[in-house]
């Protein structure tokens, strides 16, 4: 890949133009690929695509495997019949058009995406189960983590009830049942995000543009990665990061 001299541009997905609060995998992303090709560029460098939470930094994510649901193209969901235009066009997405308002984005994106979920669960796509199976090594823990986090009002996992905090087997089964629909919702978000991201990557590759990614080398202390793999992290007795 790097044997020949070539140039490119660093532009994170979030910095692409958008009417809906933040840059995403929409027509502007495809137009940027066209721009790079016309400008004689060969590389598009991006930052980590993982979900952001407190601090809104991709270097402090709740998962190093998942994609950020903010990057889902709402227009694409509309074309597929999961959304209606009026369900997301008339929403206030930001205070200033040149700035991302993460508070508004969090509230409004999930409100809109849950409307898509209401339609999705009535007619689940044929390839959804295979997506979940192929990514089960991280997706199951991630979706459960997000769902249980919602159940506890967004509290860090080390403040949850002791049984689920320490991932006791019976507690895992109990919360899978309690949060079943919410788990499916978070899996759906990843299904949409990965489908759109892979489509954009293929378009870039077909047009001679290679994407240089960035590794999310720091995980948040309150993350699915730490919760599901606490034996490989330096934690105190309460499962918080140890000095």
Identify what each model region corresponds to.
Residues 2-230:
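Acidic/aromatic-lined carbohydrate-recognition and catalytic surfaces
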Residues 223-243:
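Metal-dependent catalytic core segments for phosphate chemistry
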């Amino acid at each position: 890949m790097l044997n020949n001299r070539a140039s490119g541009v660093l532009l994170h997905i979030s910095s692409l133009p958008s009417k809906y609060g933040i840059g995403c995998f929409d027509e502007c992303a495809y137009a940027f690929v066209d721009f790079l090709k016309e400008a004689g560029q060969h590389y598009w460098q991006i930052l980590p695509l993982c979900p952001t939470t407190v601090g809104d930094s991709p270097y402090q994510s709740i998962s190093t495997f998942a994609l950020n649901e903010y990057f889902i193209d709402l227009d694409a969901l509309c074309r597929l019949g999961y959304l209606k235009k009026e369900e997301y066009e008339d929403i206030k997405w930001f205070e200033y058009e040149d700035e991302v308002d993460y508070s508004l984005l969090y509230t409004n994106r999930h409100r809109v995406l849950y409307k898509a979920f209401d339609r999705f669960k009535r007619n689940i796509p044929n390839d959804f189960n295979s997506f979940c199976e192929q990514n089960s090594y991280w997706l199951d823990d991630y979706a459960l983590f997000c769902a249980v986090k919602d159940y506890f009002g967004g509290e860090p996992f080390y403040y949850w009830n002791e049984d689920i905090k320490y991932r006791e087997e019976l507690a895992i089964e109990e919360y899978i049942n309690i949060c079943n629909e919410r788990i499916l919702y978070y899996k759906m978000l990843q299904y949409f995000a990965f489908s759109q991201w892979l489509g954009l990557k293929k378009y870039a590759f077909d047009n001679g543009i290679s994407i240089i990614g960035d590794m999310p080398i720091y995980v948040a202390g309150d993350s699915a990665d730490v919760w599901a793999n606490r034996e490989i992290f330096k934690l105190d007795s309460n499962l918080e990061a140890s000095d």
